[in-house]
Curated annotation (Swiss-Prot):
Region Caveolin-binding, annotated ranges: 71-79
Species of provenance: Homo sapiens (Human)
Assembly information from the UniProt record: Tetramerizes. Part of the core of STRIPAK complexes composed of PP2A catalytic and scaffolding subunits, the striatins (PP2A regulatory subunits), the striatin-associated proteins MOB4, STRIP1 and STRIP2, PDCD10 and members of the STE20 kinases, such as STK24 and STK26. The STRIPAK complex can be extended by adapter proteins such as SLMAP:SIKE1 or CTTNBP2NL. Interacts with CDC42BPB.
Compositional bias ranges of the Gly residues kind: 1-13, 23-43
Organism domain of life: Eukaryota
Protein name in the entry: Striatin-3
Keyword Coiled coil among UniProt keywords: yes
GO molecular function per UniProt: armadillo repeat domain binding; calmodulin binding; protein phosphatase 2A binding; protein-containing complex binding; protein-macromolecule adaptor activity; small GTPase binding
Keywords (A to Z) from UniProt: Acetylation, Calmodulin-binding, Coiled coil, Cytoplasm, Membrane, Phosphoprotein, Repeat, WD repeat
């Protein structure tokens, strides 16, 4: 019983010094380490039994060094923990403050951007109102000080000095200089302006001494402060070129008499515009203008540019006619201007009639050659003239040809087949990209600070910058073996795939699930077609998307009714989906093609025959081709795009044959004239027909893609397209791009005009030295797809 009990809630019990064990009979003493400060302030121990215990309780508590150290360590640890909590809270609050500050700054930037857009829209709206008012009433709409909004800074807006009065000399000179600059940019120099004003002045019998300075100032102020700025009028030339050409129709009537042209020149131009052109005569070069006016050939040449004057005037005769105001300006619209200017309408009419008679009496004046003008218009690409009807271009070509033949300039030549170089931008770029492809602002493109003409002139050189780049979007993973064929629904974002696992699957690209660790989306099939007893090798969908056809290694063609794109994948079995079976082939069906014109189906088989079917008939097989295997075993088949009464079939011998579907006779044999001993390398894997041109394209086992003329049967181009066998081809609906797939695991997109590769995509992995089996374009949406031996189908957008 000599040991002491450790007390309190703190440090370990310690043996007391011998002087503390004075109680007789081994009574327990008090340990300062047990109930002292180091012990954590625990309650005192029981009193000792001996009488010596009483004096010990009256002594002060004693502290030990270990107990004190323990207490300090305990308090330090608590302090450190609280400080760590405080620092964490401070960091969280600082992060919260930074986030709120950033959010506030972002909201302020958004507000500034919206205010800027609102001001730009208000400015554009005022301009449109002024243009509409001028077109409808023939007078300028007074909107006060209409100017471009500025966005330098808020301080600049608040402290912006008021502009000078509009009638001040400085504003007048600056406006004249700005107008002259924009006229030079559109190719309308002072010399041409002076010649035209001199001609109109002499026509109307007016002298140079007429005091018209105030009228000139008024017209200039209308140009500067009215509905359109000179910059926008310069842009209007490019935008309304098709309307101007169609209005004046000067190309179609290239060989007509001079009377019609002069009538249009006199009656189609408002007197106010003529006055403005007369006033331009005050600007230098008067001697040169007089010399040029005396030359009748120069006058005739200058008349060719009347459409530029009208377009530069903005609201001239061309726009008035195109908007349905008749072939002449309404005299009621001109009467207020005539009254203000004190113009004698009777004198002008008399002078017009006299001038017409003089023009009828003129003989022997040779019309200027317009070939350069035609070439200039032809050089304008589709980016600058997107809305000119093709008929106008054809008329210009025919007019140019008539004039050239009349002059005996050159003999006729056979033109080579040219592929379209533009026009399919909406498919390749997408509808939203087309709206942004001009300048990125749509209708607000006119409100930029820089010169808009520079953008339009640079567009043809920068076409590649606006070309769409295809990126993988959807991955279709539910097949258990290689995907041999695929086809898009003609309207919906729906895809059908055919696989070696004996099934076809229907996919709705709008029903997606996120893929793991990938930017693409996985799509689950919404329906599985089961009827084949072997691998499915070929596929075709009807033009209305209501039926599809599949050919397999079991020598049958299954005819399916397409389920709804919103079908439930877990619905009960629907027997009506399988519409029928076309039986006739005796070996694997390797190719199918459907024509919606007569609802006919073509199939080619390893039995050596090509068959034409009408599934609606009781005897669906209409005709059989190559029954004697004269050309070999067919590998692929397609309808001729520009002549649906013909079809083209490729064979394993390396040749392709065009057949007449009615007579069953072979019309043209497309041969590349290679050594017949290399038959294995000359094997054609796929043949497609261009949708609009008489051109057939073939994909070969020897890595080549070849182009043939359907009329002559001659090869017009050949190129090494891939690093391995080319297995599949597809032409986009506009006939501008060609897509090819190969066993080198790549998809390549080709420009048919230049025969150059514009994009390469690595899409699939190899399986048994095979990779891509099929590629396809969607006929109405911006989708392309590929099918591979790795049991995957991929869709790109």
């Amino acid at each position: 019983m000599d040991e002491l009990a450790g007390g309190g809630g703190g440090g370990p019990g310690m043996a007391a010094p011998p002087r503390q064990q004075q109680g007789p009979g081994g009574n327990l003493g008090l340990s300062p380490g047990g109930n002292g400060a180091a012990g954590g302030g625990g309650p005192p121990a029981s009193e000792g039994a001996g009488p010596a215990a009483g004096p010990e309780l009256s002594r002060p508590q004693q502290y030990t060094i270990p107990g004190i150290l323990h207490y300090i360590q305990h308090e330090w640890a608590r302090f450190e923990m609280e400080r760590a909590h405080w620092e964490v809270e401070r960091a969280e609050l600082q992060a919260r403050i930074a986030f709120l500050q950033g959010e506030r700054k972002g909201q302020e930037n958004l507000k500034k951007d919206l205010v800027r857009r609102i001001k730009m829209l208000e400015y554009a709206l005022k301009q449109e109102r002024a243009k509409y008012h001028k077109l409808k009433y023939g007078t300028e709409l007074n909107q006060g000080d209409l100017k471009m909004p500025t966005f330098e800074s808020e301080e600049t807006k608040d402290t912006e000095a008021p502009t000078a009065p509009q009638n001040s000399q400085l504003t007048w000179k600056q406006g004249r200089q700005l107008l002259r600059q924009y006229l030079q940019e559109v190719g309308y120099t002072d010399t041409i302006l002076d010649v035209r004003s001199q001609r109109v002045r002499s026509l109307l019998g007016l002298s140079n001494s007429e005091p018209n300075g105030s009228v000139e100032t008024k017209n200039l102020e209308q140009i500067l402060n009215g509905g359109e700025s000179p910059k926008q009028k310069g842009q209007e030339i490019k935008r309304s070129s098709g309307d101007v050409l169609e209005t004046f129709n000067f190309l179609e009537n290239a060989d007509d008499s001079d009377e019609d042209e002069e009538n249009d020149m006199i009656e189609g131009i408002p007197e106010g515009k003529d006055k403005h052109r007369m006033n331009k005569h005050k600007i230098g070069n008067e001697g040169l203008a007089a010399d040029l006016t005396d030359d009748p050939d120069t006058e005739e040449a200058l008349k060719e540019f009347d459409f530029l004057v009208t377009a530069e005037d903005g609201e001239g005769a061309g726009e008035a006619r195109s908007s349905g105001d008749g072939t002449e300006w309404d005299k009621d619209d001109l009467s207020p201007t005539a009254e203000v200017w004190d113009v004698d309408q009777g004198l002008i009419s008399k002078l017009k009639e006299q001038y017409k008679k003089e023009r009828k009496g003129k003989k022997g004046v040779k019309r200027a050659n317009r070939t350069k003008l035609y070439d200039m218009i032809a050089d304008l690409g589709d980016d600058e003239l997107p809305h000119i009807p093709s008929g106008i271009i054809n008329q210009s070509r025919s007019a140019s040809t008539r004039m050239t033949d009349h002059e005996g300039a050159r003999a006729e030549e056979a033109e080579p087949i040219t592929f379209p170089s533009g026009g399919g931008k909406s498919f390749i770029m997408g509808s939203d990209d087309v709206l942004l492809s001009v300048l990125g602002l749509g209708d607000l493109a006119d409100l930029t600070v820089t010169n808009d003409a520079d953008y339009s002139y640079d567009l043809p050189a920068n076409k590649d910058a606006f070309r769409k780049t295809w990126n993988p979007k959807y991955t279709l993973r539910s097949h258990f073996d290689g995907v041999r064929a695929l086809a898009f629904h003609p309207v919906e974002p729906v895809l059908v795939t055919a696989s070696e696992d004996h099934t076809l699957k229907l996919w709705n690209l709008q029903k997606t699930v996120p893929a793991k660790k990938s930017a693409s989306l996985d799509v689950e099939p919404i329906y599985t077609f089961r009827a084949h007893i072997g691998p499915v090798l070929s596929l075709a969908i009807s033009s209305n998307g209501e039926q599809c056809f599949s050919g397999g290694i079991d020598a049958t063609i299954q005819w399916w009714n397409m389920p709804s794109p919103s079908v439930d994948p877990y619905d009960t079995y629907e027997p009506n989906v399988l519409a029928g079976t076309l039986v006739g082939h005796t070996d694997a069906v390797w190719g199918l093609a459907y024509s919606g014109i007569k609802n006919q189906l073509l199939s080619c088989s390893a039995d050596g025959t090509v068959r034409l079917w009408n599934p609606q008939e009781k005897l669906p097989c209409i005709c059989t081709y190559n029954g004697d295997k004269k050309h070999g075993i067919p590998t692929s088949v397609d309808f001729i795009g520009c002549d649906p009464a013909h079809m083209v079939t490729s064979f394993n011998t390396g040749s392709a044959v065009i057949y007449d579907l009615e007579t069953s006779q072979s019309l043209v044999i497309l041969s590349s004239q290679v050594d017949s001993g290399l038959q294995s390398n000359n094997h054609i894997n796929r043949v497609v027909s261009h949708p609009t041109l008489p051109v057939t394209i073939t994909a070969h086992e020897d890595r080549h893609i070849k182009f043939f003329d359907n009329k002559t049967g001659k090869m017009i181009h050949s190129m090494v397209a891939h690093l391995d066998a080319v297995t599949s081809l597809a032409v986009d609906p506009n006939g501008i791009y060609l897509m090819s797939g190969s066993h080198d695991c790549s998809i390549r997109l080709w420009n048919l005009d230049s025969k150059t590769c514009v994009q390469e995509i690595t899409a699939h992995r190899k399986k048994l030295d095979e990779s891509i089996y099929d590629v396809a374009f969607h006929s109405s949406k911006a989708y392309i797809a590929s099918a591979g031996a790795d049991a995957l189908a991929k869709v790109f957008v």
